[in-house]
Swiss-Prot record:
GO terms for molecular function: RNA binding; translation initiation factor activity. It is found in: Cytoplasm. SMART domains: RRM. It holds the Pfam family RRM_1. It comes from Drosophila virilis (Fruit fly). Its main location: cytoplasm. Keywords: Cytoplasm, Initiation factor, Protein biosynthesis, RNA-binding. This is Eukaryotic translation initiation factor 3 subunit G-1. Residues 188-266 form the RRM domain. One of its GO terms (biological process) is formation of cytoplasmic translation initiation complex. The keyword RNA-binding applies. Component of the eukaryotic translation initiation factor 3 (eIF-3) complex. The eIF-3 complex interacts with pix. The keyword RNA-binding applies.
Amino acid sequence: MPGVETIKSSWADEVELDYGGLPPTTETIENGHKYVTEYKYNKDDKKTKVVRTYKISKQVVPKTVAKRRTWTKFGDSKNDKPGPNSQTTMVSEEIIMQFLNSKEDEKANDPLLDPSKNIAKCRICNGEHWSVNCPYKGTAMDTNLMEKKAAAAASAAVDAPKSGKYVPPFLKDSQKGGMGMRGRDDTAAIRISNLSESMTEADLEELVKKIGPQSKMYLARDKNTGLCKGFAYVHFKQRKDAAAAIEILNGHGYDHLILSVEWSKPQNN
């Protein structure tokens, strides 16, 4: 007896027999791919099967982005699937943001790195560096500076009063002008004006230490802010060094200001 041949029907006929309408959409994940199967009617009013294949890939994102993707949707998109919906969301071009390092911001706001506030000023070439680091140190430019210092010292020695009379040692200090009850000698003291607010005692010492030895220095500061008031007094051990300081520093540019240096006027006790 010949075998009964079974006639295989198409999948569309089987679906039509099993379901009265369109079957539900199914999703399956295999080998790193996602398969979405949907059923719909075409323009000829026939059932069609549409299979979409998606490749699953892992992406490392910031924690804030991952947390934002878990937010619950609301409104018209309340029942939407994860991800953007083309009917309610328009995806624009990707914008890449570059975040600056906080250390770069601190460096930009550091007042010590501001070139307009550079306190270093060379006495030899007027450059923005200390005199000890001057590339012209020991050259003809440095020699001219030393000649000015020697000329100022010589003029101070000529102006000093000369007398052939014997003066006892205990009376020598009393004959110096400006010597008060406290033993302060104002004849070798100078007043430096037009200093910047950022001036410090170390800067003042660096400014005058190569001219000659000093006995005392005083930088006037504001009691409330602690900033320099704009002037200072320097007492040299020898009057010729004080005269040399006036000759060299008066009119000298320092910290973007022009210094004014003169003899300190004796105070009336």
